[in-house]
Swiss-Prot record:
PANTHER family: UDP-GLUCOSE 4-EPIMERASE. It is an enzyme of class 5 (isomerase). Pathway: Carbohydrate metabolism; galactose metabolism. NAD(+) binds at residues 11-12, 31-36, 58-59, 80-84, 99, 124, 149, 153, 178. SUPFAM superfamilies: NAD(P)-binding Rossmann-fold domains. Homodimer. This is UDP-glucose 4-epimerase.
Amino acid sequence: MSILITGGAGYIGSHTVLTLLEQGRNVVVLDNLINSSAESLARVSKICGRKPNFYHGDILDRSCLKLIFSSHKIDSVIHFAGLKSVGESVEKPIEYYQNNVVGSITLLEEMCLANVKKLIFSSSATVYGEPEFVPLTEKARIGGTTNPYGTSKVMVEQILKDFSLAHPDYSITALRYFNPVGAHPSGLIGEDPNGKPNNLLPFITQVAIGKLSKLLVYGNDYDTPDGSGIRDYIHVMDLAEGHLSTLINLTSGFRIYNLGTGVGYSVLHMIKEFERITGKNIPFDIVSRRPGDIAECWASPELAHLELGWYAKRTLVDMLQDAWKWQKMNPNGYNC
């Protein structure tokens, strides 16, 4: 049996593909390569000596999905595919709903036709909107999201919940990620944003290597100790291992888990720690807040620990060192 991973050439997807291949699983990847590179999968094969089956296609393309399900004995699906930039989603809401919501419905319909009943959905901590309290548990209120990206994740979660009630023999889990950072310790795969990075750590590493002149810190007037936004940063390899733990522990019905460390760090703290660990100076300017950003957000990961036996093992130092190693080895990402 094989596992279909949509968006498997992307940042989190490629690290998850690697983790599953290393565990001896058979993997099929579907990716349209709009925000990713097939080179990531070539690097995965270099690391572990095994190759996934790769399809260059889109989750909105029913014929492509039918081909995959008819050509492989798919047992379960891990669904990463989708657009993911908070800022861009504010500018292009229709594209986000089309890709993230309609695409997920299309995938689910084709899974039903192929009688594939196990699904892990890549959700996000953005579903919590403006948090009423931190740390966030899975029982916290969702909705009230501040951007279409987050809203699209809320919508898909609700669709999956409703579907699960109508089809109790399906096993569906939504994983709410916090802020993935870092890279595989080999330095061969990592985060390779198109254009200027939207996420903090690749922005920092590109400044450190001289690709960008300075970092932009979006807001220093939040109600936090140093005025900058606080987030729960989690090593991408911990996140990948979280998918393996979820796959092993899938049960019928609909489940939700936070995947985070349970510790929040501010933007300014991240800059200082990176400078301390690497010895690189990171010049930055304070600019106005981005639309849709919130002051602070970090997880309570206790439920995943209790029910999946999973917890984040890697430290902030690991995250920063691995991200920097990836950047130094790949100054232009996968476009070497």
